[in-house]
Amino acid sequence: MSTQQQSYTIWSPQDTVKDVAESLGLENINDDVLKALAMDVEYRILEIIEQAVKFKRHSKRDVLTTDDVSKALRVLNVEPLYGYYDGSEVNKAVSFSKVNTSGGQSVYYLDEEEVDFDRLINEPLPQVPRLPTFTTHWLAVEGVQPAIIQNPNLNDIRVSQPPFIRGAIVTALNDNSLQTPVTSTTASASVTDTGASQHLSNVKPGQNTEVKPLVKHVLSKELQIYFNKVISTLTAKSQADEAAQHMKQAALTSLRTDSGLHQLVPYFIQFIAEQITQNLSDLQLLTTILEMIYSLLSNTSIFLDPYIHSLMPSILTLLLAKKLGGSPKDDSPQEIHEFLERTNALRDFAASLLDYVLKKFPQAYKSLKPRVTRTLLKTFLDINRVFGTYYGCLKGVSVLEGESIRFFLGNLNNWARLVFNESGITLDNIEEHLNDDSNPTRTKFTKEETQILVDTVISALLVLKKDLPDLYEGKGEKVTDEDKEKLLERCGVTIGFHILKRDDAKELISAIFFGE
């Protein structure tokens, strides 16, 4: 059996190799050498065509172009052939012409357009292309295209459109050129007239005009059902049974983990604001709303930066509200104590959310923390506030850092003197003053409320201990008379008395006056 390889192509690769060799001045080459070279050439050509067909297939085309062959050569680390025109790029069919040579062979060549050298030479040179660069910009933020130089100008787009199709763009531009379909009183006019006759400027007095409604934010049916289901579950009045609690936790978990809630975020924010302002007496519902806020803040798939300024009023309202949860059921000490615990727990939750927001979004809103500090300071300096407002304000102060707390520390003496009515009070009679419930001028707060406020102030001052150096050696030392005098001048008698009773009084006093 013969093992000689045979070519099955319609052209003769051996003759082609022989012609190329003769053009290079190589004659009398052995036929075996020509066959070996021809088979290698044929393999290389098939390899190039195979790669070119891959590019054609990935480009979703049916016609193999010279550009595919050039890319195949580059993949095979071969310099591509230059000067071959790809007619497919200009939607022009590639055509070949046939010429019969003297030897009886047919030669095909590509029909190309003849170019006049005079016209080609006298044409101006094309502009030098710019170097390719890459940059990033926001194509859209929450579905709204930002007005930056990289994005097309909406006003230019509007002007380029005929007047009768500008309606969808007018709302986005907040323009006064409202598009109105005109119904004329004459029989010749109709709503299918030219665009110029439909513009508002061409509406004559006496004509009936109808203003199109503004473009609404359209939600899918699935999102509407989801929103209504979540809202009804979270606002259900009877949540004592196990099934209702299970549904509530499932809704909160969904808000915390689902990644397709971007379109519903503004609706949830509006719902939160409405529920807080309308239900300040319902502690259970307010607690659920705070859990809802925490779930949205914990969802890593939602971009909440544009909505933080809308969430902060809701959090601060529950933190500083004058009255939460209505009133106690009766005047018994036990009921009043439990009512204070419930309302204070809600304010503690709001303070923890405030701390979470300030730590999670420090770069998005650099003015967020100063604005919160100013709000708390303004509330702190108002001596006509009630216990709940002061408690929430002090809990909010305790989540701030040391430098912010020192702003309040400078006004603490005046605040304590006015709020706790410390006129004529010293360390010698402070304990008797605090225990004298029969004195109506003792303070405007009850003994329990006063103790809670003092403990909250001290918990905020304990944050200042972080400013002390690691090698602080004052732990366990006794407080001197000079330290007591400075403490009372800075914090007032009531707060200073409770600080001096602590085991870490010396360390806390050093933290209060650290750096002075």
From Swiss-Prot:
InterPro entries: ARM-type_fold (IPR016024), Histone-fold (IPR009072), TAF6 (IPR037796), TAF6_C (IPR011442), TAF6_C_sf (IPR046344), TAF_TATA-bd_Histone-like_dom (IPR004823). It comes from the Eukaryota. Its main location: nucleus. Residues 6-75 form the Histone-fold domain. GO terms for biological process: chromatin organization; positive regulation of DNA-templated transcription initiation; positive regulation of transcription by RNA polymerase II; regulation of transcription by RNA polymerase II; RNA polymerase II preinitiation complex assembly; transcription by RNA polymerase II. GO terms for molecular function: chromatin binding; identical protein binding; molecular adaptor activity; protein heterodimerization activity; RNA polymerase II general transcription initiation factor activity; RNA polymerase II-specific DNA-binding transcription factor binding; transcription coactivator activity. It is found in: Nucleus; Cytoplasm. The keyword Transcription applies. SMART domains: TAF. Keywords: Cytoplasm, Nucleus, Transcription, Transcription regulation. One of its GO terms (cellular component) is transcription factor TFIID complex. Functions as a component of both the DNA-binding general transcription initiation factor complex TFIID and the transcription coactivator SAGA complex. Binding of TFIID to a promoter (with or without TATA element) is the initial step in pre-initiation complex (PIC) formation. Present with 6506 (+/-1290) molecules/cell in log phase SD medium. Component of the 1.8 MDa SAGA (Spt-Ada-Gcn5 acetyltransferase) complex, which is composed of 19 subunits TRA1, SPT7, TAF5, NGG1/ADA3, SGF73, SPT20/ADA5, SPT8, TAF12, TAF6, HFI1/ADA1, UBP8, GCN5, ADA2, SPT3, SGF29, TAF10, TAF9, SGF11 and SUS1. Belongs to the TAF6 family. The histone-fold domain (HFD) is required for interaction with TAF9. The C-terminal HEAT domain is required for bulk transcriptional elongation. This is SAGA complex/transcription factor TFIID complex subunit TAF6. The gene is TAF6.
